[in-house]
Amino acid sequence: ILEILRVNDPEISVVDYDENDIMFGKHGKLHVLPYVKRDMLMLENQIPMKVLHILTKVETGADEEDDYELNTKIIKLLNPIFMEDTSSNEKIKESGKCMHVLDLYRKSLILEEPSYPPPPPTPQKGKENCLCLEAGEIDQIIRSAIELQEAGIRFKKSKTRSLKDFSFNRGVLWLPALKLDDGTEYMFLNLIAFERIHVGAGNEITSFIFLMDTIIDSAMDVPILSRSGILINALGNDKVVAKLFNSMSKEIPVERGGHLDIVRNNMNRYCKKPWKNWRASLIHTYFRNPWAIVSLVAAIFLFALTIIQTIYTVRQFYQNPNPSPSPTKSPSFPVTPRRRP
């Protein structure tokens, strides 16, 4: 692991390996490294960070453990987008001690502070704060992206890439941008397993996946999020994306009283407004099918023509209420002059 981190560090310009090396050459970086990254994030492959620190001390001869340097190398390899932030160095220092590589990678996904203000805790009276939501109740929790759009809710990309930066405000659902590729499923499944096994680790990743599963119910929901810049689909097929989120959140419990619960309640209150339901019903009935739209426009056009014709007829009647009959003229016959004998 340490050699992989060293060779793939962009700040190291000289690498003492042959270009054709199957592991550390150009071929390895292109064809082998993606699978190495995936294996580094598997829960059963985790090595305690303490072991990596000891090996680093033996290699460099340092007397003290340098969490920042080792954490930086790991994040550069596994989450390079995080390093594009100008304040990434300070955020890496805030990560502190980590149990292993997967723990550090998880922190890099949620280290950025969300753009929404932290809501005050709202304990529910008469209910336990640890009451869990079952994935089977999904239809009763949050509607799909199509249904939310019909109710007037818009989707926008959050200002940060933190997976805990999702919120709902004034009819807009803010979600962090997410790139989907062949390694996405392995990554999230291991992160969810880590949060469920380790007490006190948090449930930020689980809450995000649970939310995305509620929004993405079928392949028709995926283009809505893609057009908003929320989903970057490298899988190619919308059906595969929908199946991915629907399978990852099966039988996942999420604690009540967290940020996900607040977003859910705000969205439900917004969708329960009467005129929102009328708008959703109108769009669902008349604007789903293009032929239905054409029929509706034609009906409105004919109705408008009928009203105009009625107004014109009534107006003519009131302008000439008692029209005077025109005088009749007696028929005239031609007179032929008489001839004198």
Where is each model-derived feature located?
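Acidic, Ser/Thr- and Pro/Gly-rich low-complexity regulatory segments
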Residues: 1-287, 314, 319-341
